[in-house]
Design a protein with these regions (language model features):
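N-terminal beta-strand motif that seeds the catalytic metal site of vicinal oxygen chelate
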Residues: 12-19, 64-101, 107, 153-156, ...
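A mid-sequence, solvent-exposed acidic-amphipathic segment
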Residues: 85-143
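Vicinal oxygen chelate
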Residues: 1-84, 86-96, 117-136, 146-171, ...
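Short, flexible, glycine/charge-rich loop motifs used to bind or transfer phosphoryl groups or to couple energy/partner
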Residues: 80-81, 145-147
Length: 216
């Protein structure tokens, strides 16, 4: 299973998190048996078949399953150092740890790689492997957990070989970007795109260790 994402557009209920599967019909049947039923009729995602899942069974998130891998998007020609190389991780703000574990682990079958609480950050973080990237699910410590409130899509982190080079290129193109700063994880560098990505909190992350994903 791998992941792609369609950013929210005007009039949309929210970002659509799309999970790519080898056998769409089998994946839809399995999701339904696990309490994650399809929502409405089959549609398309580009030239591929797509089935939305019921947000009421997914903590309020807009999820879908799509068939096959399909071609990627073409990228502009830029130097390797100043290029964004891949999506590193997707961040979800959750309201209930048990609900998040049930959705991403039990129902969707993603591999839980790490579950930790960090009082200094005021957060519990769960990291699920999804293809070549990571789903980071965050709960705020000190807040009562509830299933009465929906979970939220909370942003994207893109991977780059040289955060300073990418920040300089984007600033030169007129994007409103922050200064590059050290990340929370040792050996990382990060900056924020303040504007230019509608509705979507976005950061660019340099992993000096060269590993894929924010956490093992």
């Amino acid at each position: 299973m791998a992941l792609c994402l369609r950013a929210r557009r005007e009039g949309d209920p929210g970002e659509l998190i799309v999970l790519k599967v080898a056998d769409l019909d089998a994946a839809v049947r399995l999701a339904g048996r696990r309490g994650l039923p399809a929502l409405g009729e089959e549609t398309t995602f580009g030239d591929r078949r797509l089935v939305r899942l019921d947000p009421a069974a997914a903590g309020g998130l807009n999820l879908a399953l799509v068939a096959g891998d399909g071609p990627g998007l073409s990228a502009p020609a830029v130097s390797e150092a100043s290029a964004v190389s891949a999506l590193d991780h997707v961040v979800i703000a959750a309201r209930s740890g048990d609900r998040a574990l049930a959705l991403w682990g039990a129902r969707l079958g993603l591999d839980l790689r790490l579950d930790r609480s960090n009082p200094a950050w005021g957060a519990r973080q769960m990291f699920f492997a999804c293809g070549g990237l990571v789903m980071e699910v965050v709960l705020r410590l000190g807040e009562a957990e509830t299933t009465d409130r929906p979970d939220d899509f909370n942003g994207l982190a893109w991977r780059a070989a040289d955060a300073d080079a990418v920040q300089g290129r984007l600033a030169g193109l007129g994007f409103n970007v922050s200064e590059v700063r050290n990340g929370r994880k040792p050996g990382t560098r990060i900056f924020t795109l303040r504007e230019g990505v509608p509705f979507t909190p976005t950061v660019v992350l340099q992993q000096n260790a060269g590993t894929a994903g924010a956490e093992p």
